[in-house]
């Protein structure tokens, strides 16, 4: 289905971001007709963004989460530093920012029934963790969400996709939707997410990254 034309103001604003932050690897997610029940379910899933505070009912759950957070933050910090020890991305240049980012990953992935390692793999391949990434196809943010999703599921303001939590909320809900369409087939669902269904390069890259993020 052909994408609708975005408003000139939105295109100008996104173009400015593209100039400053460069492009990311993302094919065009296909805009599709959603059955009313699916659209309502997905719209409900992306609505209401409470603080991404983990629900940890037992002390063992809390301990497992703290171990995951410490281990993953150490991995992330190592990945984000260059050979001189300088931070590559200002939006993730402090331990507090890294922790907030990972807390959001944990919350949004579990909320959608996805593994945090899978979501981190998608983020690494799609945007290289760049909060303001813009692909040549027009996908935005860390999970490279196409702007038409904000129109189909929410208020139509694509600028929210440059916010960590909103971007991950959309990205995780969309990936869960594609998994349902593909009856749990992860390779095909990832292909749909990237706009390259049936091709191997993208799913293999994400799954390789996923393995690196597993505890």
Task: List PLM regions with ranges.
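Cell-wall glycan-active module
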Residues: 1-124, 132, 152, 208-215
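Extracytoplasmic/secreted proteins, especially bacterial periplasmic and envelope-associated proteins
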Residues: 71, 75, 100, 104-107, ...
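A short structural micro-motif
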Residues: 125-129, 196-199
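Outer-membrane beta-barrel translocator domains and adjoining extracellular loop/strand segments
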Residues: 135-136, 203
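A glycine-rich, coil/turn loop motif that links secondary-structure elements
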Residues: 136-139, 161-162, 195
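Substrate-binding/active-site groove segments that recognize
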Residues: 136-155, 171
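Catalytic and substrate-binding regions of cell-wall glycan-acting enzymes that process beta-1,4-linked
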Residues: 142, 147-151, 181-215
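A short, structured beta-strand-centered segment in the mid-to-C-terminal lobe
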Residues: 158-167
């Amino acid at each position: 289905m052909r994408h609708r034309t975005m408003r000139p103001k939105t295109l100008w604003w996104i173009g400015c971001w593209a100039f400053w932050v460069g492009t990311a690897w993302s094919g065009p997610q296909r805009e599709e007709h959603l059955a009313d029940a699916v659209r309502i379910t997905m719209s409900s899933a992306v609505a209401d963004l409470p603080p991404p505070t983990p629900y940890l009912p037992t002390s063992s759950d809390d301990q497992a989460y703290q171990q995951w957070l410490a281990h993953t933050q150490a991995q992330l910090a190592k990945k984000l530093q260059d050979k001189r020890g300088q931070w590559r991305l200002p939006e993730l240049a402090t331990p507090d920012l890294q922790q907030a980012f990972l807390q959001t990953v944990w919350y949004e992935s579990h909320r959608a029934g996805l593994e945090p390692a899978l979501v981190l793999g998608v983020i690494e391949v799609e945007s290289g963790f760049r909060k303001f990434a813009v692909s040549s196809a027009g996908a935005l943010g860390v999970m490279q969400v196409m702007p038409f999703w904000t129109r189909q599921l929410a208020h139509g303001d694509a600028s929210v996709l440059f916010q960590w939590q909103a971007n991950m909320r959309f990205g995780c809900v969309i990936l869960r939707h594609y998994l349902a369409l593909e009856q749990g087939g992860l390779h095909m669902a990832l292909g749909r997410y990237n706009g390259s269904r049936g091709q191997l390069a993208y799913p293999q890259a994400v799954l390789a990254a996923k393995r690196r993020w597993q505890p």
